[in-house]
Amino acid sequence: MRMYDVIEKKRDGGELTDAEIDYFVSGYVAGDIPDYQASALAMAIFYKGMTAHETAHLTMAMAESGDMMDLSAIPGIKVDKHSTGGVGDKTTLVVAPLVASLGVKVAKMSGRGLGHTGGTLDKLESIPGLSIEISEPDFFKQVSEIGVAVAGQTGNLVPADKKLYALRDVTATVDSVPLIASSIMSKKIASGSDCILLDVKCGSGAFMKDVDSAIELADAMVSIGEHVNRTTAALITGMDRPLGKNVGNSLEVIEAVATLKGEGPKDLTDVCVELAANMLNLAGKGSVDDCRKLARQQITNGEGLAKLAQMVKAQGGTDEVIFDTTKFEAAPFRRDIVSETSGYITSMNAELVGISSVALGAGREKKGDPIDPSAGIILERKTGDYVEKGDVIATLLTGDESRLDEGERIFREALAFGESAPELEPLFFARVSKDGVERFA
């Protein structure tokens, strides 16, 4: 077999065989296929697409390119959740303990933040002492004993994706549904859970800017899951405006704790309850309606919060900051962003809010950049709110005073004002499962 022939076949719109896909993935990981041929195939896939079977086989070949976690020794159904990323998206910190507190095991491998979206691991690492580097035996033990663990990817998980993702990033082939779907699902499948819930964001702060492209991606990922016998569903949720009021690392942990106490912002609480309900439903805990009630009950009775504290302690963190969030170290420098006009906030571009928080030190512009755990933004007002000239819209926080001017400049760019209240985008657009697409909006 020659790589040239595989590239030519896809360039001309042909369907690759399983053997051709295996040849490409194993050869690329081994270093036998050079980057220039891999990028030529990625571009051919970008233009010609892939069938559902091709995409599923590519996903499995990538998943099997390294270690595969076998969670079968852990009793019960294991569920995983993946978010395609957004601004203020601290849902894992709420949803994982909520679901685990109802007896469903959550074994989650998470990522770091890159670009304008924050990573769950960076948020968790703002908790003093907490480690996200957990050995495989300890990960298994923690999931078995307390029902939940959130860790960084261990060892040699999906090396094919690491190589292919880095290549797509510099060859303008990121925005391809088969390549995005196989990248996400290969990691989820290699992580070993029985059920996978996908939170596919759409809007200005998301990777997918419109509902139809978000549904197309969700459908591709659900199809892959069903092809490889993983119960999979996806929710399409809005990311036109930041989720909740806090954007940052420790700031988002503080808001997640408030949400588990029943004191969180309504939008964040509603999204977390919906995600938890759908995860519980996939695990066979009842209808989505019944599971929604169960999730809200675990907020009211405090069991979700107790489970988060248990997880933090198990991973070496100081659980007292969960019970008293004032013990988090506060940022030494802050600046109020005051409205220069009176009127309704008609838009608060989530992507620019995210970029502003990165400028303040809450995220990284390139891999390996250090993160300021206390930096970020507290939103006092959001899209749809009326403000008078002089009202505080947000507070910027940072450990480096020199970052405030740039943070403010970008944040102000995110805002638009008008004389009448805007129509707010819904939080939920659709649910995608093996039964098809159910649209809510």
Q: PLM features: residue spans?
A:
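Short glycine/serine/threonine-rich phosphate/pyrophosphate-binding segments
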Residues: 87-96, 100-101, 108-109, 115-118, ...
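Alpha-helix C-terminal capping segments
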Residues: 47-48, 93-107, 187-192, 224-228, ...
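Phosphate/diphosphate-binding glycine-rich loops and adjacent basic-rich segments that engage nucleotide
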Residues: 144-195
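Active-site cofactor/substrate anionic-group-binding motifs, chiefly glycine-
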Residues: 49-110, 114
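A glycine-rich helix N-cap at a beta->alpha junction
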Residues: 123-149, 219-225, 229
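Short beta-strand segments
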Residues: 109, 143, 151-153, 199-203, ...
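N-terminal glycine-rich anion-binding loops that anchor highly charged ligand groups
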Residues: 1-2, 10-72
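Well-ordered secondary-structure scaffolds
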Residues: 5, 10, 15-17, 28, ...
